[in-house]
């Protein structure tokens, strides 16, 4: 049941403060699927899409993999260009019913696309709608385990 989001086009959205185990949980969830997966920090994906970027990280490859893990959504500088690139990746996966696991320090939910503390405020209403469709959200809490 915990991996039921795999059956649809949904995402597994993991949010929480720094150091609460979001990345660790995301990779464990991807491995638990038993399917091929790719893991990339969002900033690296965006850097790779710029001219002269890493040719191994292509939109086609990100769209085709069974499960994609995008780490630290919202850490990128929000521009129209980054919003367009992220939307193209998420939308293509959504259209092809491919699950995506996403980690973020931002809060899930919210009803305003103008509050940057919420994921919707950081990525915009259009992208957030795709992420929310059929998704499971999980908010982690606690102290930064790397500082303990």
State what each model feature region is.
Residues 1-7:
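Pre-Walker A adenine-sensing motif
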Residues 8-26:
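Walker A/P-loop nucleotide-binding motif
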Residues 8-9, 64-65, 96, 134:
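Structured helix-beta-strand junction loops
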Residues 11-13, 36-37, 67, 99-101:
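Residue-level preference for the first positions of well-ordered beta-strands
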Residues 25-30, 52-58:
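Short secondary-structure capping micro-motifs at structural edges
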Residues 57-66:
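Short basic/glycine-enriched coil/helix segment immediately N-terminal to the Walker B
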């Amino acid at each position: 049941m915990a991996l039921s989001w795999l059956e649809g086009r949904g995402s597994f959205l993991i949010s929480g403060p720094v150091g609460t185990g979001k990345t660790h949980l995301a990779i464990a969830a991807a491995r638990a699927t038993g399917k091929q997966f790719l893991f990339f920090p969002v900033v690296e994906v965006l850097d790779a899409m710029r001219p002269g970027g890493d040719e191994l990280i292509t939109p086609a490859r990100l769209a085709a993999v069974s499960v994609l893990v995008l780490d630290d959504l919202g850490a990128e500088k929000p521009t129209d260009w980054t919003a367009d690139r992220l939307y193209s990746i998420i939308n293509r996966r959504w259209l092809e019913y491919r699950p995506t696991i996403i980690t973020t320090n931002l809060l899930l939910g919210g009803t305003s696309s103008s509050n940057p503390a919420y994921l919707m405020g950081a990525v915009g209403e259009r992208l957030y709608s795709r992420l929310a469709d059929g998704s499971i959200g999980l908010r982690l809490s606690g102290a930064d385990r790397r500082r303990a």
